[in-house]
Amino acid sequence: MARTVIAAFDEFVKDSVNLDSERTKKARSSRDWLVDQVLGFPDKDSDFPAIYAEKYIFFGSFARRTKKRPLDDIDTMIALKAQGCTYLEYTDRIEITVPDTSAQFKKLCNDNASILNSKKLINLFVKNLKNVSQYENADIKRNQEAATLKLLSYEWNFDVVPCFFTTEDPFG
């Protein structure tokens, strides 16, 4: 039992706000293992687009080390090689146009169009996550722009968000 206000505050922060350091280590290890599995998807599924292995991004409060209890969400972006895809920004959306030369992305387009369907792309992530044997009992689904993975063995969810690494066009 704390004897001073400062000691009571420190105890409160340690026990109720800050993440437990051992759980944090376990979460980072679990996140890193997940990323390793995702990086292997193109080798196991010929329909899965190429990944920029060096371009995955840890983001969100857990990555920024500003997450407070409970540890319930870990966010990761996985960068895909654009393979000639281009994008246009509108006020309400971004459209990715897929060239005929990109067979893997063509399969993920809207019917009879060359516009990438983000739901199909995320569902491809979901399908491949379900094929990881350690995740066979996990709750895996598409949630907006992420493939969400809820493990039975941990209290946190993983949100895996696909993104693209493109090169500049002549206009910047």
Question: Model-predicted segments: where are they?
Answer:
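Short loop/turn segments at strand-loop or loop-helix junctions that form parts
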Residues: 78-83, 161-163
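N-terminal regions immediately upstream of nucleotidyltransferase
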Residues: 1-71, 82-110
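Acidic Asp/Glu-based divalent-cation binding sites
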Residues: 75
